[in-house]
Amino acid sequence: MTNIRKSHPLMKIVNNAFIDLPAPSNISSWWNFGSLLGICLILQILTGLFLAMHYTSDTMTAFSSVTHICRDVNYGWIIRYMHANGASMFFICLFMHVGRGLYYGSYTFLETWNIGVILLFTVMATAFMGYVLPWGQMSFWGATVITNLLSAIPYIGTNLVEWIWGGFSVDKATLTRFFAFHFILPFIIAALAMVHLLFLHETGSNNPTGITSDMDKIPFHPYYTIKDILGILLLILILMALVLFTPDLLGDPDNYTPANPLNTPPHIKPEWYFLFAYAILRSIPNKLGGVLALVLSILILIFMPLLHTSKQRSMMFRPLSQCLFWILVADLLTLTWIGGQPVEHPYIIIGQLASIMYFLLILVMMPVASMVENNLLKW
């Protein structure tokens, strides 16, 4: 008799994805982030569901309902902070996951990579709308500033912004629809993640060498299940340390002030995980140019397979490309820092230089370095 996990229609899918899946024997801890992202998503959906049970998406009561969750609901404070800091952990894992893909050339799996980029955009949209829901000062002004960027689109811009707002300013209609979208999007993300996995399992995983591993596979369970469990425990450890010791470390104090359309905060800035893109946006004096640079800073990932000029897939044996990759990481950290600083000297010029450097590294320097390395192979 065949094992039920191999014969049952549903169990068979789980078996082929998480148990008997042939996996390369040499994938490092950088391959842990996929499962960690899955755990983050489940955690966000669960904590979000419990928050939604007590939250009211009305401008008059939204801020009070969040206060009520923290003060009066049993363990409401821990649910709220797990959700807020869970988003930060989600983005840390996302950035690591994308960085791994860039370093080891995983973007050559075109369908998997493109769905991954769509997932990144969807998660960013979800996080942005979630930040608006507590209806604090930074929620309100963040929503106003970011949605207003769409007005830079020629001809239809203004109409588009008013259509998204549901009126002539960010108000009750905006908050209600943002709550609706924020609730539905994680389920769309879950569906996309399944398609992401489906395409990945068509080709099998990449590995650090970038060389085919068809002749050297091991079963996913128990080798990588136990490895994933270690990653999950570390993730929960870091998340709970944040939640229980410094829950407001990554938040903005302005968001503890109820939204007031008549009073603009001195420094409007998004959550830390959007600061790099925000810095690129601010570094261009022209509104439309800034918006285009903002979108391109993430959309550029779609073009990575086209920009791959090396004869080798991975950067494992390419010291020049490695060097440029880590300069890119440093550049992104610089942009993140600049995004949180006021618009004044010397931050403006640093932001502009870092933005130019970002696009130069990806579009020019890395492809050129790859071609140089190709020629060095002949020596």
Curated annotation (Swiss-Prot):
Signal sequence, renumbered to the chain: none
Binding residue positions for a ubiquinone: H201
Keyword Protease tagged: no
Any GO CC annotation of this UniProt entry: respiratory chain complex III
GO biological process: mitochondrial electron transport, ubiquinol to cytochrome c
Topology within the bilayer: Multi-pass membrane protein
Disulfide partners: none
Entry keyword set: Electron transport, Heme, Iron, Membrane, Metal-binding, Mitochondrion, Mitochondrion inner membrane, Respiratory chain, Transmembrane, Transmembrane helix, Transport, Ubiquinone
Transmembrane segments: 33-53, 77-98, 113-133, 178-198, 226-246, 288-308, 320-340, 347-367
Chief localisation class: mitochondrion
Keyword Metal-binding found: yes
Cofactors, names only: heme b
An MF annotation (GO) of this entry: ubiquinol-cytochrome-c reductase activity
Residues reported in the UniProt entry to bind heme b b566: H97, H196
Location of the protein in the cell: Mitochondrion inner membrane
Binding site for heme b b562: H83, H182
Cofactor note: Binds 2 heme b groups non-covalently.
Subunit structure: The cytochrome bc1 complex contains 11 subunits: 3 respiratory subunits (MT-CYB, CYC1 and UQCRFS1), 2 core proteins (UQCRC1 and UQCRC2) and 6 low-molecular weight proteins (UQCRH/QCR6, UQCRB/QCR7, UQCRQ/QCR8, UQCR10/QCR9, UQCR11/QCR10 and a cleavage product of UQCRFS1). This cytochrome bc1 complex then forms a dimer.
Similarity section: Belongs to the cytochrome b family.
Miscellaneous: Heme 1 (or BL or b562) is low-potential and absorbs at about 562 nm, and heme 2 (or BH or b566) is high-potential and absorbs at about 566 nm.
Function: Component of the ubiquinol-cytochrome c reductase complex (complex III or cytochrome b-c1 complex) that is part of the mitochondrial respiratory chain. The b-c1 complex mediates electron transfer from ubiquinol to cytochrome c. Contributes to the generation of a proton gradient across the mitochondrial membrane that is then used for ATP synthesis.
Name of this protein: Cytochrome b
